[in-house]
């Protein structure tokens, strides 16, 4: 359960930061004002950053009975998935590609990092807790990344074809940004 809570912290941090004016500048999230709209930009940055570190605090909590090897594997994987080669890099690519023509492989790379890496972590963590082999954990990681990519493709499709009422946010925003 602690790993699930940590994942939700990482997910929430990434959404709060993604909505910031310096990123996507989304005013709504799930039909409600984005964090920076409701509490201000500085508080949103601090909230997102706090959630990122809280995820690791939750995993290392002593009351959860993970052995040190598994705990270290999970911490390392979560850092990789959320950091400079994962979610953060995916966000950077999103900014870099804004209003530019993109090749399909660039879109896939960005989406695998921005969204797929968190799904990657979820399945890897299951393999770690279940003491699976490295080969099995690698398979689970790749499967998670592919599921994340499919999720993001579906989200992009809904952004293009859905309605504000259905999604709880303005639609066709991603299309306008290229």
Q: Where do the model's predicted regions map?
A:
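Acidic catalytic motifs of isoprenoid enzymes
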Residues: 1-100
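Active-site alpha-helical segments that house and flank conserved acidic catalytic motifs
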Residues: 1-23, 76-88, 116-127, 137-165
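Divalent-cation-assisted or electrostatically stabilized phosphate/pyrophosphate-binding catalytic cores
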Residues: 25-52, 99-118, 138-142, 162-178
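Short helix-capping/hinge motifs at transmembrane helix termini and TM-loop junctions
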Residues: 131-132
């Amino acid at each position: 359960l602690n790993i699930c809570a940590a994942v939700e912290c990482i997910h929430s941090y990434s959404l709060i930061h993604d909505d910031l004016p310096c990123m996507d500048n989304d005013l709504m999230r799930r039909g409600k004002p984005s964090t920076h709209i409701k509490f201000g930009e500085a508080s949103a940055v601090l909230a997102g950053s706090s959630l990122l570190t809280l995820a690791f605090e939750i995993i290392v909590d002593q009351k959860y009975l993970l052995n040190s090897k598994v705990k270290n594997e999970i911490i390392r994987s979560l850092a990789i998935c959320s950091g400079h080669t994962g979610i953060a890099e995916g966000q950077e690519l999103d900014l870099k590609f804004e209003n530019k023509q993109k090749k399909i492989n660039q879109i896939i790379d960005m989406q695998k990092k921005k969204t797929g890496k968190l799904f990657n972590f979820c399945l890897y963590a299951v393999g770690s807790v279940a003491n699976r082999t490295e080969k099995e954990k690698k398979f689970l990681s790749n499967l998670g990344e592919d599921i994340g990519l499919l999720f993001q493709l579906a989200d992009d499709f809904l952004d293009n074809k859905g309605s504000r009422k259905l999604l709880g946010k303005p639609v066709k925003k991603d299309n306008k940004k290229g």
